Amino acid sequence: MRMNDYQLEDDPVTKQKYFRRYAPRKGDKIYKEYKKFFFYSDAFRPLKFACEAIIEKYEDEIFELIAQEANHLADMLCNEKSDLCGTPTNSPEP
């Protein structure tokens, strides 16, 4: 995941903030054209900060799971340890 492919937006219904992808994916028709341009923006900084904060908050749990060689590390961390992967409250990506 490239953080600078996302920007922070407000959900028009719930007013909650969420990260929305604005960059095309490799399989999209416009991808080759899009890659010809360089975009620099600080718009991804809130996502980077959010990810770093999650990692810092759950650092001990992350190391514990890695040490145990958990088979489904991502699922366990997301669902069991942090409870961050509940039902989505934001709009799906286009």
Curated annotation (Swiss-Prot):
Coiled coil: none annotated. It comes from the Eukaryota. InterPro entries: CNPY (IPR042415), DUF3456 (IPR021852). It holds the Pfam family DUF3456. PANTHER family: CANOPY FGF SIGNALING REGULATOR 1, MIR-INTERACTING SAPOSIN-LIKE PROTEIN. Belongs to the canopy family. This is Protein canopy homolog 1. It comes from Mus musculus (Mouse). The gene is Cnpy1.
